[in-house]
A protein has these predicted regions:
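Pocket-flanking alpha-helical
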Residues: 13-18, 111-144, 188-189
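Structural transition elements
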Residues: 25-60, 78-86
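Ligand/substrate-recognition segments at binding pockets and active sites
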Residues: 58-131, 153, 174, 202
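Solvent-exposed, polar/charged alpha-helical surfaces in well-ordered, non-transmembrane soluble domains
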Residues: 3, 7, 12, 16, ...
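Acidic/polar loop patches that form or flank catalytic/metal-binding clefts of enzymes
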Residues: 15-17, 100-107, 194-196
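Short, solvent-exposed loop/beta-turn-alpha elements that line the ligand-binding surface or hinge
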Residues: 35-52, 63-69, 116-120, 141-170, ...
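Short, solvent-exposed turn/loop segments enriched in Gly/Ser/Thr/Pro and often Arg
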Residues: 21-24, 30-31, 129-132, 195-203
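Short, solvent-exposed loop/turn and secondary-structure capping segments
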Residues: 16-21, 28-29, 83-87, 136-139, ...
Length: 239
């Protein structure tokens, strides 16, 4: 059923039309140019495919949506005019058009939203997560490795995923470690621990006399979020 929903959502419509190209479509957890990013390697698991979505829903026992349970999609403090609110409405419409299932949108106060989420009392939610540190562990291990109720946002569990995350946490060799994360992300996308929708775009402006911000392997000069610890940054003479 999760796989059917994943293939029924058109990430490109959400990113390019609804959110006006301020984001890029997402098919996995790690965003473009994030450490461990593997391009479109795992995209097929969650790309928009209406026929495949209908087939999977039929195999799950709900042909043309018949007998599908009533489900609410929770959002926290996000009215219909917000980014989350607009995306929720589009997802609601797409699931109706592709799978003939009706999802109700429930907007609740933020504290209630997170309390119920960590109690695993939300059947379906729409939200986001920002990394704590630039490493796959932050977006894969911290968010998705299974934990007891009250310690994580969801009750999704996959033993192979957990094993790979734990191996990566102990591994010292860079290539081997990132290989574990690559396979873990494949498991996450294919088993649909979550349906991935978009990654935000960030734009930086800085004065020419700000020096010492190091170029990363993709030619960018990141200075945002948790990429702000630079011991060689200084003010130069160019003004």
């Amino acid at each position: 059923m999760r796989q059917a929903i994943a293939h029924a959502v058109d990430q490109k419509i959400i990113a390019n039309v609804v959110l006006k190209q301020t984001v890029i479509p997402a098919y996995t957890m790690l965003p473009t140019h994030f450490p461990g990013y593997v391009g479109d390697k795992h995209q097929a698991y969650q790309q928009f495919d209406p026929n495949r979505a209908r087939q999977l829903l039929n195999e799950a026992g709900f042909p043309n949506g018949r007998g599908f349970p009533k489900v609410e999609m929770w959002i926290g403090d996000a009215g219909p005019e917000t980014v989350i609110g607009q995306a929720a409405q589009v997802i609601q419409q797409q699931l109706k058009e592709v799978l003939n299932i009706q999802i109700a949108i429930r907007n609740v106060q933020g504290n209630t939203y997170f309390q119920r989420m960590y109690a695993w009392e939300i059947p379906m939610s729409l939200g986001g997560f920002g990394y704590d540190f630039p490493d796959p562990q932050s977006l894969l291990g911290v968010v998705w490795r299974s934990q007891p109720k009250g310690f994580t946002r969801h009750d999704w569990r996959n033993d192979r995923f957990d094993e790979l995350i734990d191996r990566a946490a102990r591994e010292l060799d860079h290539d081997t470690r990132f290989g574990y994360y690559d396979e873990a992300e494949q498991v996450l996308a294919s088993d649909v621990g979550g349906v991935f929708l978009w990654h935000r775009l960030a734009h930086d402006l800085r004065k020419t006399w700000v020096k010492g911000i190091k170029q990363d392997q993709w030619g960018n000069y990141p200075f945002r979020g948790n990429n702000t610890t630079y011991y060689e940054m200084y003010i130069g003479d160019e003004r």
